[in-house]
Structures are given as C-alpha cells and as structure tokens.
Regions:
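Interdomain "pre-motor" coupling segment immediately N-terminal to P-loop NTPase/helicase cores
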Residues: 9, 17-69
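Conserved alpha-helical scaffold flanking the Walker A/P-loop in AAA+ ATPase domains
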Residues: 89-96, 144-167, 182-183
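Hydrophobic positions on the alpha1 helix immediately C-terminal to the Walker A/P-loop
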Residues: 117, 121
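Post-Walker A helix-loop "phosphate-sensing" segment adjacent to the P-loop in P-loop NTPases
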Residues: 122-135, 145
Length: 183
C-alpha cells in the first residue's frame, strides 16, 4: 500500500467512513484496472460506504432485538412441523402484518418450532430496519412488575412495548393467568 493510499484510509477512518476505508484499496485497484472515470470511482466508494452503514444498522437492530439466537426461515424444517404450511409462513415473511399492526400467534405443542418461526420473522424484520424486540413472557412480566413497584410502569411499558414496530413475546403459555390483568 502506498503512503498516499495509507493517508486516504487514515482520513476515511478519521471521518468515520469505515466502508470506504475498508474498500478503498481494492476499489482503487479495480478502478485503475478497468480505467474507470473519477466519477465512477467515487460512486463505487460511496456505494461501499452506504452498504457498510446499512449492514451496521441491520446488525444493531438485530442486537437490540434481544434474540436468544439468530434463526432464519431457510433453517426451518417445514417437513418436520406440518402445522405451519410453507405458503402461510412465506406470506408472513412479507411482513405486511407489521405494517397493518396485526398480531400473529403461533400455537402448538412444545418443540414444533414456534420460537424458531417467531425469531426468524423478527430477524427478517430487523434486516428491513423495523424496530423489533424479543421477550420471553416471564422476562417481560418480571420487568413490568419491577417497574410497577418502582412507580415507573408507564415508562417501562413505553420502553418495552410501545417503542417497537414488532414485539415478539415468547412462551406465553408458561405463565399463570393473574387476576386483575396487570402485574
């Protein structure tokens, strides 16, 4: 790497252009080999930066979602779980239900892939930059009960529930029903 290339990479890092910094040398070499115009070269650099930022945003959304593991629809065994028809799940994968603010409930016995499907749809939502949050019902209730004891129930509800475009609450069937409805 020439000293000038090194300075360009350092400047990119200083200006927080990590995508350009990571791709600069390879793109400069490609531009020289293909005799790209300066404008074409700059466009390639800017597209690399944009994609880098989008990837970081998707990673951040997935991290904030709090998934116990990353699951995808490609990993789901539709042959094993016959109660979830592929066509219906692929319809859900359009995430139109999120835009319509509709609820989706997966019902079935333990071990058929309800959590896998919920996480896979949630992960897909994070990749489309929807604010998404995953909770087990028990964790959500414990958090809300603690907030109520501290007099911060409304704030906790907003932070845990209302702030997200997609909220996934897993293992609801494992909680006892509490008279009064609120923790």
């Amino acid at each position: 790497m020439s000293i000038q290339h090194q300075r360009v990479v350092e400047l990119c890092n200083e200006l927080r252009l990590g995508g350009v910094a990571a791709q600069y040398t390879a793109l400069a070499q490609k531009a020289a080999e293909k005799h790209l115009s300066f404008t074409d070269f700059v466009e390639e650099l800017l597209m690399a930066e944009r994609e880098s930022r989008r990837a970081r945003t998707r990673e951040m959304f997935a991290r904030i979602a709090g998934f116990p593991a990353i699951k995808t629809l490609d990993q789901y065994d539709f042959a094993f779980a016959t109660g979830a028809p592929r066509k219906q799940i692929m319809e859900l994968a359009s995430l139109a239900f999120v835009e319509r603010a509709e609820n989706i409930v997966f019902l079935g016995p333990s071990g058929v892939g309800k959590t896998h499907l919920a996480i896979a749809l949630g992960y897909l939502a994070t990749q489309k930059r929807y604010k998404t949050r995953f909770f087990s019902a028990a964790d959500l209730m414990l958090m809300l009960e603690a907030a109520q004891r501290q007099g911060r129930y409304r704030q906790a509800m907003h932070r845990a529930v209302n702030a997200y475009k997609l909220l996934i609450v897993d293992e609801i069937g494992y909680l006892p029903v509490i008279p009064g409805g609120r923790p």
